[in-house]
Amino acid sequence: MIRKRRKITRMRGSRTVGGGCSKKRRGAGHRGGRGQAGGHKHHWTWIVKYDPKHFGKYGFKRPQKLIKRLETVNLAYLDEMIPELLERGVASEEDGMVVLDVRDLGFEKVLGSGRITRPVHLKAYEFSRSATEKIEEAGGKAEVIE
């Protein structure tokens, strides 16, 4: 149980209640403005010492239009979905190999996470190196479409 008397009660009758000179409590004048005010003027030495990179531009930002954002899919997901895709008619089976165009599923690039358990002939705009290796290991084919 807390038995400490509140500071405001203890300071009754003291006029400034622990705030020093009464002018110090008025507005933000005593501290030279609020926050970062005066960074170019009277707080310049503070800026130089504690936040030297506050003004100006630093670093490099890649132009957003040069960044390629592709819809990707992993081999594990495709391997899991093959029976359903065959059933729906999105994929077909030719020469004991499942033929699938991943663009029909809304994907543009095939990534190599997971493993593929059957030979597949996949068509996409791009394949990662590991995806190509795994597809060919399983006896399949990775066809890049321009």
Swiss-Prot record:
Query: What are the recorded Gene Ontology BP terms?
Result: translation
Q: Which SUPFAM superfamilies match?
A: Ribosomal proteins L15p and L18e
User: What keywords would UniProt list here?
Assistant: Ribonucleoprotein, Ribosomal protein, RNA-binding, rRNA-binding
InterPro entries for the chain:
Rbsml_uL15_N, Ribosomal_uL15, Ribosomal_uL15/eL18, Ribosomal_uL15/eL18_sf, Ribosomal_uL15_CS
State any GO CC term. cytosolic large ribosomal subunit
The Basic residues compositionally biased stretches are 1-13, 22-38
Give the start-end ranges of region Disordered.
1-38
Which one of the record's GO molecular function terms can you name? structural constituent of ribosome
Which top-level group of life is the source organism from? Archaea
Flavoprotein as a keyword of this entry, yes or no, is no
Q: Spell out the family assignment given in the record's similarity comment.
A: Belongs to the universal ribosomal protein uL15 family.
**Can you state the subunit structure given in the record?**
Part of the 50S ribosomal subunit.
- Protein task: Binds to the 23S rRNA.
Q: What is this protein called?
A: Large ribosomal subunit protein uL15
The record's gene field reads rpl15
